[in-house]
Swiss-Prot record:
Modified residues (Cysteine amide): C69
Recorded GO CC terms: extracellular region
Record key words, sorted: Amidation, Disulfide bond, Knottin, Neurotoxin, Secreted, Signal, Toxin
Name under which the protein is recorded: Conotoxin Leo-O3
Tissue expression per record: Expressed by the venom duct.
Prosegment location in residue numbers: 23-42, 70-75
InterPro entries documented for this protein: Conotoxin
GO MF term list: ion channel inhibitor activity; toxin activity
Source taxonomy: Eukaryota, Metazoa, Spiralia, Lophotrochozoa, Mollusca
Length: 75
């Protein structure tokens, strides 16, 4: 009897945790969708030139170990 009660409480607790997590992640999906549309709307020429720092605007070529766009040791 005690084991049955413990199992029922555990199942209810895990179900409540999953429902709470689903509520929290629902808002993040909206932001992810917005982020993906802004990436798609970016023009292919919207990139940093060689020698610029790798950061918010992606490098046209690649980012090297020193954190700069262009040739050299790549990450």
């Amino acid at each position: 009897m005690k084991l049955t009660c413990v199992v029922i409480v555990a199942v209810l607790f895990l179900t409540a945790c999953q429902l709470a997590t689903a509520d929290i992640s629902g808002g993040m999906r909206k932001h992810r969708a917005l982020r993906s549309t802004t990436k798609l709307s970016r023009s292919p020429f919207d990139c940093s030139s060689p020698g610029a720092f790798c950061g918010l605007v992606p490098c046209c070529d690649s980012c090297n170990v020193l954190g700069r766009c262009g040739s050299g040791l790549h990450v």
